[in-house]
């Protein structure tokens, strides 16, 4: 018995929901760390503000379209999760970051979404509403999928995949596959097309990870700390280590006669100080007895 397109769309929608559910929960370790340390530790709220906007946009689209329940379920969940993330970040962030977060939320999530809602609901005719909103969602989704280009460029430039978590790339690629088939089976190119690009970039990221992966290397750039700052600290440590090693191993390094005489004088002086301290200690003990 042939399976209908509607049933297949539901199956891929459920699979997409399950995978996207875990992707939404991926930042939990970050916020557990923020909660335990009572500090945002240099993390930024921008990704979560953008994710909140995306969830609002796709929820609105699914409600207008009326036959995309799977989009409503996952984006409703994402909406709640992103609000929790932003709230936790705001609570533990310094004053400057709090102000910046409020500005982003007002500009992107309130004014941005508000403008789209007014345009599509009150200005655009009902017959064109879904089409126009679909184009807006598609353009936004494409811009989000293009975002990893910065990471890809960084991996190629540094020839290191330490900035690119393979697991997240894999699940995002898998999610793109599920939502592509969901959109294709619903004959909705606004859902399907952006996920083609998402799949391509996801596969590219995994290939680059396998090419530039360094076995045993788990060095990651902590949020809020630049590699330049780390390298400066490393240089200082190397200098300090060099000074210690030189002082301990000077007798192994060839020296000219002047240096040797100076070294002997210093050593004799140190020995004399030790003997003097020893004699003073003995005199102190005798006088005490």
UniProtKB/Swiss-Prot annotation:
| Start and end residues of each MtN3/slv domain | 11-96, 131-214
**Organism, per UniProt?**
Arabidopsis thaliana (Mouse-ear cress)
Give the residue spans that cross the bilayer. Answer: 6-26, 44-64, 71-91, 104-124, 132-152, 166-186, 191-211
Name of the protein in its database record: Bidirectional sugar transporter SWEET10
* Compartments reported by the entry: Cell membrane
Could you tell me what this protein does?
Answer: Mediates both low-affinity uptake and efflux of sugar across the plasma membrane.
Give membrane topology per the record: Multi-pass membrane protein
Assembly: Forms heterooligomers with SWEET8.
Gene that specifies this protein: SWEET10
Principal place where this protein is found? membrane
Q: Which Pfam families match?
A: MtN3_slv
- Provide a GO CC annotation, any one: plasma membrane
Recorded superkingdom: Eukaryota
User: What conditions trigger expression of this protein?
Assistant: Induced by the pathogenic bacteria P.syringae pv. tomato.
């Amino acid at each position: 018995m042939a399976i209908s397109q509607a049933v297949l769309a539901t199956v891929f929608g459920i699979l997409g929901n399950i995978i996207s559910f875990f992707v939404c929960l991926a930042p939990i370790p970050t916020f557990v760390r923020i909660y335990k340390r009572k500090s945002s530790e240099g993390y930024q709220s921008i990704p979560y503000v953008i994710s909140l906007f995306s969830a609002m946009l796709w929820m609105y689209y699914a409600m207008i379209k009326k036959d995309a329940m799977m989009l409503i379920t996952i984006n409703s969940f994402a909406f709640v999760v992103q609000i929790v993330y932003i709230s936790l970040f705001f609570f533990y962030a310094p004053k400057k970051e709090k102000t910046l977060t409020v500005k982003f939320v007002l500009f992107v999530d309130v004014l941005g979404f508000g403008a789209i809602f007014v345009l599509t609901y009150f200005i655009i005719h009902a017959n064109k509403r879904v089409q126009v909103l679909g184009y807006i969602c598609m353009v936004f989704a494409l811009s989000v999928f293009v975002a990893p280009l910065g990471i890809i460029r960084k991996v190629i430039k540094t020839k290191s995949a330490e900035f690119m978590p393979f697991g997240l790339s894999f699940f995002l690629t898998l999610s793109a596959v599920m939502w592509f088939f969901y959109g294709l089976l619903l004959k909705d190119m606004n859902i399907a097309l952006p996920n083609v690009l998402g799949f391509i970039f996801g596969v590219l990221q995994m290939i680059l990870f396998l090419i530039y992966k360094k076995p045993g290397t788990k060095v990651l750039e902590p949020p809020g700390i630049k590699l330049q700052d780390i390298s400066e600290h490393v240089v200082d440590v190397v200098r300090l280590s060099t000074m210690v090693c030189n002082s301990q191993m000077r007798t192994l390094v060839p020296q000219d006669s002047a240096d040797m005489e100076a070294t002997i004088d210093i050593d004799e002086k140190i020995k004399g100080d030790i003997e003097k301290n020893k004699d003073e200690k003995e005199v102190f003990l005798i006088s005490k007895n």
